[in-house]
C-alpha cells in the first residue's frame, strides 16, 4: 500500500489541522514501511475539542432515547458494511493477521455498539414512596463530556467499547487513540458522523500520550476518563484526573493471568486453550493466560501437545488467509519482548521453543518474534512476575489444589484467570477463590458485549461492557416532591 495522506484531527464533524504543528509517523510493523504522517493534538486542540463536545452533547442529550438508538444502530450497519475495508486498515496499522481483524476486531466492536444502542431506552429512574404526601423520584442523567484513551492492541474495538456506552447514556466523547495505531479511530469518527451523530459528540485527537492524554486528564471540562493501557500509565491518568477536577475513571490495565490445568483435564483441550491464551494476536492481549500451571505428573505430556500445536502457527504475509500469527505492533515493543526473553534464559527458564526473532521469507524487515514457550519456570522469575505482552508462555508445575490457588493469586495483577477441569464442583470451588475480574472455565478469551470485563487489584477500576457500564456513564439525581403544606420550625 502506498503512503496515506497526512492524517488530521477530527473535531466537530470534520477533519481539522492541529494547532500544535507537531506530527508523528505510524508504521506498518509487518515490513517497517511508514503508513502515514499524523498530526498531534496540542493543548489548544484539546480546548477546541472540549468546547465542540459541550455544544454537541447538549443536542445529543436532548434527543429521545429512540432517536439516539436509531443513530447508533445506523453506525452499526455502516461498520458491518465496511468490515473488510476497516479490517485491512487495522491490519496495516497493527500488523495483526487479516484473518483475525476481519473476523474479530470490527465484528466485536460493532456488537458492543449494537448492544448499547438497544439498551438506551432502558435507562430510567425510580420512584420511592416516603409517606402519603411525599415521594422521591430519581433520574439518570449523562455526565457531559467524557474522554477515552485507547491502547494500541485493539484500536477500533477499544474505541467502540468506550464510545458505545458513553454515547448511549447521552454523553459526548473525546477519544485519543494510541499514537502507535491511530488510523481506524479516525475512520470510526467518519462513520458516526455519516450515521447522523451531531457534530462534536465524538471527536478524535491523535497525539502522544504524555502530552495529549495528559491535557485530557487535566481538563476541567471533562467529567470522566476511561483508560486502557499499562498499570504505570493508568496510575498517572488516575492521579491527574483526581487532582484536576475529581473526575470519575475507568481503568482497564495490565495482567499476568493464571491458567490452571487440573489432573483430570483433557490435555488436548488444555493445550488448545493455552495456545489461544498465549499466541492469539501474537500474545498482545491484556487477558492472556501467560502463567500456565500444570500438574507435575502431566507436564511432560502437556509440553509435547504444546509443541505439536506450535507447529500449526503460520507466520507470513498478513493478508494471506492461512496466516494466523503476525508481527508485534512496533519495533520498540519487539525489542522489549526480546529483552524479557533474554531475561528468562538468564534466570534459568528452559526454552521449549522459540526464544528469538522470527526470520524467513518476507519477515526480515518486520517486528517479528517467534512464538516462545518457557518451561521449568519458578514464581520469582521476571518472565513469570511481569507482563510481557508478547508471544511468551511460561509453564509452571504444581502438586496440590491449595498450592496452585495460592501461587495463582500471588501477583499484583487480577485481570483474568481460567481453569481446565472435568470436575464441575472443583471448577466453581477454585474459580471462586481466584482473585481476578474475568474468569473462564474450560474456555478462554471471549468477552461478549453482555459480559462485564475489568480487573481486581492493580489490573483496573470499574468495568467495560454489560449493563453496569452504561449506568457508570450516568449520574443519579434525586428529587423529593412534597404535596402537603411545608412546615417550617421558624
From Swiss-Prot:
Residues annotated for K(+) 1 binding in this entry: 26-27, 93, 180
Annotated GO biological process: glycine betaine biosynthetic process from choline
Residues of the site described as Seems to be a necessary countercharge to the potassium cations: 248
Catalytic activities: betaine aldehyde + NAD(+) + H2O = glycine betaine + NADH + 2 H(+)
Known pathway: Amine and polyamine biosynthesis; betaine biosynthesis via choline pathway; betaine from betaine aldehyde: step 1/1
GO molecular function, one term: metal ion binding
Amino-acid positions noted as binding NAD(+) in the UniProt annotation, renumbered to this chain: 150-152, 176-179, 230-233, 254, 286, 387
Similarity-based family: Belongs to the aldehyde dehydrogenase family.
Quaternary organization: Dimer of dimers.
Protein name: Betaine aldehyde dehydrogenase
Source organism (scientific name): Escherichia coli O157:H7
Lineage: Bacteria, Pseudomonadati, Pseudomonadota, Gammaproteobacteria, Enterobacterales
